[in-house]
Amino acid sequence: YYGLTSLQHRGQESCGLAVSRTDGERGNVQFHKDLGLVSEVLREDTIRNMEGDLGIGHVRYSTTGASVAENAQPLVLSYIKGTLALAHNGNLINTPELKWELIQNGAIFHTTTDSEVIAFHVARERVHSKTVEEAVLKTARKLKGGYALVIMSPRKLIGVRDPLGLKPLCLGKRDNTYVLASE
């Protein structure tokens, strides 16, 4: 909560939080997101009901996609291998091509963001990969532009940035806790 509040200067349109328990059932990701400031969307009663030892959050100022609740992040997808949540900062220059590839294979989009295109590609690659890390790497190789991603499966947290570091991704560690931030 406080980390998202600290990053709110980079986006005050919407925010959200997704959490998972690594000892829980496969695919058990709780999330809450909406339009508004962190203090308005992630109220104490909402946060109190979310339990997990993994989590990702996001504050948004739209550069692509409309300013609607559906576009708030993190995006959470359920698919045949479980659930994944994705928080994305950046802009892709090949979104139309990546989206068209998915549409031709039957994808139905619920947002107008390039973030959903990325999440669908990760899920699609995961179906044919041994690990979620492998799926993320395969997807990252397709992306063109500046981006930082934090992706959460029910038991793993993965951070990736564009090869040139146009969008920074910071890693912090304290004791056995890791923190990723694209700021």
What are these regions (language model features)?
Residues Y1-E183:
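Conserved short alpha-helical segments that host acidic/polar catalytic motifs at enzyme active sites
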